[in-house]
């Protein structure tokens, strides 16, 4: 039996943004690690303001923060999908979850290195 392809109803930009903010809200409430990343981001922003880093370094720091938070949201989305698919032990789902967690770790380490280099350079030249 051939079914026509699924065609979602057109949505307004307001609805799309509402759903996106809902997703961020769910990510913050559902994941304690997301809150840790937000606290770390606040510390980084405060330290960058205190050290008066230049606009290029601000851009790098904010990009790193955004990448880590986005990776955490993707990880959360994969976790929600895995729970919806199967509650039993499943090697493929476990691998997907581990890879997603690895992506968060890689972005977090990269962000820490970038932040460390920026702050170390600023602290040693001030």
Regions from the PLM with identified roles:
Residues 1-77, 85, 89-91, 101-126:
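Hydrophobic alpha-helical transmembrane segments
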Residues 82:
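Active-site-proximal acidic segments at structured loop/helix or strand boundaries
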Residues 96:
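Short basic (Lys/Arg) and small-residue
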């Amino acid at each position: 039996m051939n079914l026509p392809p699924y065609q979602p109803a057109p949505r307004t930009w307001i609805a799309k943004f509402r759903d996106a903010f809902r997703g961020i809200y769910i990510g913050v409430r559902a994941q304690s690690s997301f809150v840790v990343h937000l606290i770390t981001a606040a510390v980084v922003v405060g330290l960058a303001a205190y050290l008066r880093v230049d606009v290029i370094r601000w851009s790098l720091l904010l990009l790193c923060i955004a990448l880590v938070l986005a990776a955490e949201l993707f990880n959360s989305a994969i976790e929600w999908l895995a729970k919806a698919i199967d509650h039993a032990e499943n090697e493929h789902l476990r691998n997907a979850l581990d890879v997603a967690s690895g992506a968060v770790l890689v972005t977090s380490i990269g962000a820490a290195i970038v932040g460390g280099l920026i702050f170390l350079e600023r602290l040693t030249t001030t």
